[in-house]
């Protein structure tokens, strides 16, 4: 697989994992829509030292429970596998019996690397949105600080060794089971034709051997039948010779 395709697979896999975890997080966020909103309307308003900070409380044990469920791992593996299919990375799957093994390897990779520690580190703090709206004339807002501590999960995953091991392992799995496409599409076609041709040649050899076998059996039976006829004919000839001798 080329470097560009590997990078795309790595990036897409990371996005799928982060989106899947985020979907589980939404079920565990105690305040689904957290937002700080400050509106300044009218004229001549003066605001000093405005500070906004927002954190959504999140039960990490809830997220860990959902992430460790078998359904989550299976669904995540299905999403990754489908994504790889959409990229035509697994182009040879119609010829390759290893599709099931590939999917199993991906699932095992997720189980090993997506640990509760990684999940807890990436979802322990989640922030919403800070909004400051000023409308009107002559309004002054000084020393306004907006602290947004929203942790983008994909960034957390990309910086995590465990997540890197996950995506790297999946990429290696794809490389292993998609060795045809790692060379060249036309090489894949040539290999496919060669494989079919070899199967045809094997079938032809088998047919020839069967025909030769039939000929050998036929020749053996025919020779045996002819030998039996000759043995039956010998007494008749002897009797005829004796009769002729007696008449003489």
UniProtKB/Swiss-Prot annotation:
Domain of life: Viruses
Cytoplasmic side: 2-199
Keywords noted in UniProt: Capsid inner membrane protein, Fusion of virus membrane with host cell membrane, Fusion of virus membrane with host membrane, Host membrane, Lipoprotein, Membrane, Myristate, Signal-anchor, Transmembrane, Transmembrane helix, Viral penetration into host cytoplasm, Virion, Virus entry into host cell
Extracellular side: 221-248
Membrane topology: Single-pass type II membrane protein
Gene Ontology, cellular component aspect: host cell membrane; membrane; viral inner membrane; virion membrane
Function: Essential for viral fusion with host endosomal membrane and core release.
Subunit structure: Interacts with A151R.
UniProt-recorded name of the protein: Inner membrane protein pE248R
């Amino acid at each position: 697989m080329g470097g560009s395709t590997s990078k795309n697979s790595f990036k897409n896999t990371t996005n799928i994992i982060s989106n899947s975890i985020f979907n589980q997080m939404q079920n565990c966020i105690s305040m689904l829509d957290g937002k700080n909103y400050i509106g300044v309307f009218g004229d001549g308003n003066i605001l000093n030292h405005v500070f906004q900070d927002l954190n959504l409380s999140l039960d990490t044990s809830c997220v860990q429970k959902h992430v460790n469920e078998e359904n989550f791992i299976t669904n995540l593996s299905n999403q990754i596998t489908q994504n790889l299919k959409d990229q035509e990375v697994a182009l040879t799957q119609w010829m390759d019996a290893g599709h099931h093994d590939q999917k199993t390897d991906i699932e095992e990779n997720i189980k090993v690397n997506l640990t509760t520690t990684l999940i807890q580190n990436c979802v322990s703090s989640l922030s919403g949105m800070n909004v400051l709206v000023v409308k009107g004339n002559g309004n002054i807002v000084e020393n306004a600080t907006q602290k947004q501590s929203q942790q983008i999960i994909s960034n957390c995953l990309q910086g995590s060794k465990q997540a890197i091991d996950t995506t790297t392992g999946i990429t290696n799995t794809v490389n292993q089971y998609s060795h045809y496409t790692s060379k060249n599409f036309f090489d894949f076609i040539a290999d496919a034709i060669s494989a079919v041709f070899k199967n045809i040649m094997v079938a032809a050899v088998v047919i020839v051997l069967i025909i030769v076998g039939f000929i050998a059996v036929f020749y053996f039976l025919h020779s045996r039948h002819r030998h039996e006829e000759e043995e039956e004919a010998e007494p008749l000839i002897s009797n005829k010779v004796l009769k002729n001798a007696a008449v003489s």
